[in-house]
């Protein structure tokens, strides 16, 4: 009787163990609750997620935990591609039907041994990362993509997520990443659908693309189809070097972006080759497309580009053509251009009605251009339609440039003329904004 009981116990234990590892929709150990998350301990477990995710099985409300450093085993001689979880959800950047909606905690473990080589303009070459699509409820946190990985893909390429509507937090990329076409980011390729957050994440890898390469985020979807912009990049740090083959769109934090960037730092070197069409190069954001919110960011890296080169922002595009304030940003790196619109904080604005104003910003980096025409260069701005507001600082010892404030503190805008077309002029030794035939101070108080 005792032997029979012992045999029954062994069989029961085996059945229970088997149930824990293979009876759920992911074929992972665990039950998917916060107290008993699905366990990811091998490359095979990531493959199991990729194989089993679908529009009806996105992981919504479920928890996943990486329990060990994971080596995929790839090398240059024997490449192993990214798992590209939820790629089936993507038709294009404007049509992302679903994504991974679970909560994945990397446990500060490192992913290694990925040698990704699919970089053609086809289904295999596009939208590659560990996760191709992250849904609105999806969270990926505390995950490290190691330095021995290598990623060369076509577009919207990154280490952690390709297209994201969800939240990426406390993730690190140490690998070099290349996009044969556009939009390479150290942490995420592209934010879509008006939502998506990247918080407290760092990049150490070198990021390259044909156009738009950035340390944290390649870019974000923008346009009139998005009615509410909730994109956020906050407290992120880039240490990696950036460049593009078209000399278009390199930046320390984000390439083409619409939304809020706060308290981010770039220490990477940004160096673009000499090209007549080169544009949009900056320490934080290469080009703001629509909604502009930029506060508390710092650039410490040296920046070399062609035109539209800024310590913080390269260019503010026309976009929604609304007013915006760039505040409390600091540039400490050298800013060097070869053409027009070179600025220590913001290089250029293409807005016709919207006024871009700088407040509480500081530049201590040397700003130069090799262009013969040196009328569109300044220690703070590279275009006269950008307003120098209150409490900005140009460090002592820097050369006075064409678009710097004059000695009496008045910006270089002709009295009551010249810039009236962009709704601002100097009145009584102060910059005044015109809106609907009324005058306002830079702080928004109406002048009667």
Language model segments and positions:
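Surface-exposed repetitive/solenoidal architectures
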Residues: 20-418
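Terminal non-domain segments
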Residues: 2-8, 40, 427-431, 435
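C-terminal outer-membrane/trafficking sorting elements
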Residues: 416-448
């Amino acid at each position: 009787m005792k032997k029979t009981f012992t045999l029954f116990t062994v069989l029961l234990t085996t059945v229970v163990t088997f149930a824990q590892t293979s009876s759920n929709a992911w074929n992972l150990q665990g039950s998917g609750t916060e107290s008993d998350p699905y366990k990811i301990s091998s490359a095979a477990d990531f493959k199991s997620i990729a194989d089993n995710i679908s529009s009806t099985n996105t992981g919504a409300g479920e928890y996943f935990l990486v329990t060990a450093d994971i080596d995929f085993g790839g090398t240059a001689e024997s490449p192993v591609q990214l798992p590209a979880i939820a790629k089936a959800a993507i038709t294009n950047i404007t049509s992302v039907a679903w994504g991974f909606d679970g909560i994945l905690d990397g446990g500060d473990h490192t992913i290694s041994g990925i040698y990704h080589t699919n970089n053609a303009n086809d289904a295999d070459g596009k939208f590659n990362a560990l996760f191709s699509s992250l849904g609105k409820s999806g969270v990926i946190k505390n995950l490290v993509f190691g330095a021995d990985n290598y990623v060369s893909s076509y577009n919207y390429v990154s280490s952690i997520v390709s297209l994201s509507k969800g939240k990426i937090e406390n993730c690190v990329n140490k690998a070099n990443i290349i996009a044969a076409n556009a939009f390479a980011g150290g942490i995420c390729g592209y934010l879509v659908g008006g939502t998506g957050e990247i918080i407290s994440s760092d990049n150490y890898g070198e990021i390259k693309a044909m156009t738009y390469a950035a340390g944290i985020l390649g870019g974000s979807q923008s346009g009139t189809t998005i009615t509410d912009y909730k994109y956020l990049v906050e407290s992120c740090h880039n240490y990696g070097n950036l460049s593009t083959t078209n000399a278009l769109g390199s930046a320390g934090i984000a390439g083409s972006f619409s939304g809020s960037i706060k308290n981010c730092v770039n220490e990477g070197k940004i160096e673009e080759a000499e090209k007549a069409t080169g544009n949009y190069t900056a320490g934080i954001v290469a080009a703001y497309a629509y909604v502009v919110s930029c506060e508390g960011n710092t650039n410490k890296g040296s920046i070399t580009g062609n035109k539209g080169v800024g310590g913080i922002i390269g260019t503010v595009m026309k976009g929604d053509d609304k007013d915006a304030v760039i505040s409390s940003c600091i540039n400490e790196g050298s800013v060097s251009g070869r053409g027009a619109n070179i600025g220590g904080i913001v290089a250029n604005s293409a807005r016709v009605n919207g006024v871009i104003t700088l407040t509480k910003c500081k530049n201590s980096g040397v700003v130069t251009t090799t262009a013969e025409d040196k009328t569109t260069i300044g220690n703070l701005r590279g275009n006269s339609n950008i307003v120098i507001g209150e409490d900005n600082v140009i460090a002592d010892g820097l050369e006075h440039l064409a678009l710097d404030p004059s000695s009496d503190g008045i910006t270089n805008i002709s009295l009551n003329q010249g810039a009236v077309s962009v709704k601002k002029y100097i009145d009584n030794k102060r910059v005044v904004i015109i809106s609907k035939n009324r005058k306002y101070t830079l702080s928004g108080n109406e002048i009667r």
